[in-house]
Amino acid sequence: MNVNEILKVNILDGLDFQGTLGYSTNNAARDEQYLSIDWYQYDGTPIQNENSPYPAKEKSSYTKSSARTDNYTASAFLTYKKLFDEAHDISLMGGVQYDYAAYDYSGTKAMDVEAAIESLNGKGQIYIDKVDRWEEAILSYFGRLNYNYKSRYMVEVNARYDGSSKFLPKNRWNF
């Protein structure tokens, strides 16, 4: 699911505001079966095959897992444009952006399962196979200055200051 909204407002002549909000989510579920196969001779006698690529019944397994990722985005910026004396065209823009992501995963596994039943069943142990969770965020401040003289000479200056949760606190913020 994805949802995005944009708000644009003309505050004054030449001064505009734009804000955006966004959300997206992704869900995934997985069922995995690793089942044993019984091998027989033509006369119906079971074959005990140690070299089989399929597990013995007690080593068969069924794993059920699910994962979810949520992403949030918000940004806002102001833009100012003005032409002075029909020669000096100036544009200023400044803003902020925030991105946040969260991930959740869990998996459960059952051993020694019955092949005919597709659920977490079994005579053996049922246990948590894996649990994982993480979050990350980025906050950014940015700006731009454009100057244009009679559409002949142009200068542009950009700056951006970012902070990320992926880095250690002493390295978290940088240009």
Predicted regions and their residues:
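Ordered, soluble secondary-structure elements with a strong preference for glycine-centered loop motifs
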Residues: 68, 169-170
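Secondary-structure transition into beta-strands, especially the periplasmic turns and strand N-termini
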Residues: 5-23, 80-94, 147-155, 166-169
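Substrate-binding groove/exosite segments of carbohydrate-active enzymes
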Residues: 12, 29-30
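Transmembrane beta-strands of outer-membrane beta-barrel pores
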Residues: 23-29, 82, 96-104, 159-165
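Outer-membrane beta-barrel transmembrane domain signature of Gram-negative proteins
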Residues: 35, 39, 45-152
